[in-house]
Curated annotation (Swiss-Prot):
PANTHER family: APOLIPOPROTEIN, APOLIPOPROTEIN E
Designated gene of the protein: APOE
Residue numbers carrying Methionine sulfoxide: M142
UniProt region (Lipid-binding and lipoprotein association), positions on chain: 209-289
GO biological process: AMPA glutamate receptor clustering; amyloid precursor protein metabolic process; artery morphogenesis; cellular response to lipoprotein particle stimulus; cholesterol catabolic process; cholesterol efflux; cholesterol homeostasis; chylomicron remnant clearance
List of residues that carry Phosphoserine: S146
UniProt superkingdom: Eukaryota
Protein name, as recorded: Apolipoprotein E
Main location: secreted
Membership in a protein family: Belongs to the apolipoprotein A1/A4/E family.
Function: APOE is an apolipoprotein, a protein associating with lipid particles, that mainly functions in lipoprotein-mediated lipid transport between organs via the plasma and interstitial fluids. APOE is a core component of plasma lipoproteins and is involved in their production, conversion and clearance. Apolipoproteins are amphipathic molecules that interact both with lipids of the lipoprotein particle core and the aqueous environment of the plasma.
Subcellular localization, as worded in the UniProt entry: Secreted; Secreted, Extracellular space; Secreted, Extracellular space, Extracellular matrix; Extracellular vesicle
Lineage: Eukaryota, Metazoa, Chordata, Craniata, Vertebrata
Amino acid sequence: MKVLWVAVVVALLAGCQADMEGELGPEEPLTTQQPRGKDSQPWEQALGRFWDYLRWVQTLSDQVQEELLNTQVIQELTALMEETMKEVKAYKEELEGQLGPMAQETQARVSKELQAAQARLGSDMEDLRNRLAQYRSEVQAMLGQSTEELRARMASHLRKLRKRLLRDADDLKKRLAVYQAGASEGAERSLSAVRERFGPLVEQGQSRAATLSTLAGQPLLERAEAWRQKLHGRLEEVGVRAQDRLDKIRQQLEEVHAKVEEQGNQMRLQAEAFQARLRSWFEPLVEDMQRQWAGLVEKVQLALRPSPTSPPSENH
């Protein structure tokens, strides 16, 4: 079966070599073909090299299939998705615990914004994981198709697979940037709401302290000032803690962004390397067979061409 599979791939590449060259971009590197001497080899040696190529590719076919069926990328993205959603949930619960006793309206607004961001992030990362699983299933299905279907779909499938991987990586990159901006904006609005709500209370405290100072004297004024400073200190503490959490979630989003972008680059490089490997395996064989066949046809034509008849010599 392996020898038959390799023979099918050789015939496929010989038939759609021109299509593959047109669909691959200029950025994809190709393995340089080893130079050959000017003296052409006999066609028997060319046939021997053909079987040598088949045996060589047969030893590599299992490795190629293992690379195509590898699920390490999907597993790493799954773990990364779970870790990210866990951190978002922990931040949401901590922020609700800090703002709950002070401002229920602010707590409800922040909770709603964080739930929406959490749902969008989880949905998009789950979509990316499902797409990667779909790519793997399509590759497995492609390897099981008949010779005619495989020959018709090979060139376009490789190009579409590469474009989809690049498009999904770029889409996820843009969405993460939107989430980062949304988280920053939501946290800033929450801090502003806290200041707006407690600002009048501080002013009322100052006004009451001034009024009571005229009635009860200096000791009561000092107590009111101490209460105002204590309340102001608590407000500043809440603001600092919320800002720290905002910085932490920004850093986590940047790390997630970097990891996902790295995974996208790795998938793109793997696809390009696999395409280059296929071409480097079979292009030298196809070119060598075409050259040897042309030489054989030329030799046969020369052998079948009638030789000119020499004139008879006269004896004197």
